[in-house]
UniProtKB/Swiss-Prot annotation:
Belongs to the universal ribosomal protein uS9 family. GO terms for biological process: translation. GO terms for cellular component: cytosolic small ribosomal subunit. It comes from Picosynechococcus sp. (strain ATCC 27264 / PCC 7002 / PR-6). GO terms for molecular function: RNA binding; structural constituent of ribosome. It comes from the Bacteria. InterPro entries: Ribosomal_Su5_D2-typ_SF, Ribosomal_uS9, Ribosomal_uS9_bac/plastid, Ribosomal_uS9_CS, Ribsml_uS5_D2-typ_fold_subgr. This is Small ribosomal subunit protein uS9. Keywords: Ribonucleoprotein, Ribosomal protein. PROSITE patterns: RIBOSOMAL_S9.
Length: 137
């Protein structure tokens, strides 16, 4: 088990990535609060409830949303990418907590890393696929 104990409270780690975002997640037994980069989850995600619902969804699948605090160090990308990275990190930490959690999380798709990233810009084009205007004559 990859859990670290602090004052008899085990800490479960998980790392999540999405687009350009990386989130290191710690699950600590607690009351269900979310702390992202030393700020409350509501404050960090600009009080947009959709982001908090996304990152708590693996806990809600297992019925553990009020039993663990989520402590996150996230960087890179934007809020959407970071929220999805935290979701993957929480799911991986829940697998560390109990290997039996893996099956329901896998069925819901929480353990699958989303491989879609920004496509690079090609020379001769304005963006990745946007070509200059074509003139027939």
């Amino acid at each position: 088990m990859n859990a670290t104990a602090t004052q008899d409270r085990p800490i479960y780690w998980g790392t999540g990535r999405r687009k350009a975002s990386i989130a290191r997640v710690r699950l600590v037994p607690g009351s269900g609060k979310v702390v992202v980069n030393n700020r409350s989850g509501e404050d960090y995600f600009n009080r947009i409830p959709g982001y908090l619902a996304v990152l708590k969804s693996p806990l809600e699948t297992l019925g553990l949303e009020s039993e663990y605090d989520i402590l996150v160090n996230a960087h890179g990308g934007g809020l959407t990418g970071q929220a999805d990275a935290v979701k993957l990190g929480v799911a991986r930490a829940l697998c560390e907590l109990d290997p039996d959690n893996r099956q329901p999380l896998k069925i819901e798709g929480y353990l699958t890393r989303d491989p879609r990233c920004k496509e690079r810009k090609k020379y001769g084009l304005h963006k990745a696929r946007k070509a200059p205007q074509f003139s027939k004559r």
